[in-house]
């Protein structure tokens, strides 16, 4: 029986790239491994959900599509997708094709003795100001959380590492910071970023500052947590809130979450 890899992708207004992304992931993962593709539509305002349904209908692979009842942000959507994953390994990448699916194989090959391998960002496909602020943010993240300074959300993780991350007692999620806070054995592998497949980045300057603030809150919240803090409550609430469909025909709609 082949090993299963779960590929988790947060989706926000990515209808133009989803079909190509799904094809490239399948060609990269199969047939060496069994693919579980998990797409999390984080309240897109375009037709991303419709495209996801079409991919699910046409795909021979196991595909799980989750639609959040409210916008969780990229990191919240990633953690929700990971909470549904069943693979021995999990890969996380963006839906805009800047994270090249073909790099997953190299990250897995470099994972011996590690819990997580980041795709160390290489290549400049953004303005100078955004490039410099991004470097500053990742340097701060590395100093506070202990992850590689070139780490981004594109990474592969062992099943046990995912469980450690989801068990962290934080209510302000910052996915990359949580990998560091869980004290996982992590490293980075240089990976060239591609040009954006379509559209433009949803990260305005204000939103990038908000992400940095959430990262700082996540780290401080964990460092100064009470000894009896609840484990995994936030992720459990998000998981219960979602609508999930897979290509077995199952539809689960638990309704709105308690807020």
Could you describe each region identified by the protein language model?
Residues 68-70, 74-84, 89, 98-173, ...:
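Acceptor/aglycone-binding surface of glycosyltransferases and processive sugar-polymer synthases
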Residues 34-36, 49-84:
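Conserved donor nucleotide-binding strand/loop of the catalytic core
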Residues 174-259:
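Hydrophobic helical membrane-anchoring modules
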